[in-house]
């Protein structure tokens, strides 16, 4: 189920404050955040936001195509590890 339109998008207050400060100052320094559940809003376009994935900070450059998505979508938390390839075939 999606979020109600009347509530509006969720964005952490500290992240929103930092984005507004960066836009006002004109600096393009990466903003670090743990808030993976925050929605990307149009005010963030052009900024780089470093999202924590539990181990490292993943830099995400915000473009117009990313508006409406969540920050956590672009910082994967799980690493894919495939099974070892066993070439032990009987009869060769």
UniProtKB/Swiss-Prot annotation:
Pfam families: Ribosomal_S19 (PF00203). It comes from the Bacteria. Keywords: Ribonucleoprotein, Ribosomal protein, RNA-binding, rRNA-binding. GO terms for biological process: ribosomal small subunit assembly; translation. InterPro entries: Ribosomal_uS19 (IPR002222), Ribosomal_uS19_bac-type (IPR005732), Ribosomal_uS19_CS (IPR020934), Ribosomal_uS19_SF (IPR023575). GO terms for cellular component: cytoplasm; small ribosomal subunit. GO terms for molecular function: rRNA binding; structural constituent of ribosome. The keyword 4Fe-4S does not apply. SUPFAM superfamilies: Ribosomal protein S19. HAMAP family: Ribosomal_uS19. Belongs to the universal ribosomal protein uS19 family. Protein S19 forms a complex with S13 that binds strongly to the 16S ribosomal RNA. This is Small ribosomal subunit protein uS19. It comes from Treponema denticola (strain ATCC 35405 / DSM 14222 / CIP 103919 / JCM 8153 / KCTC 15104).
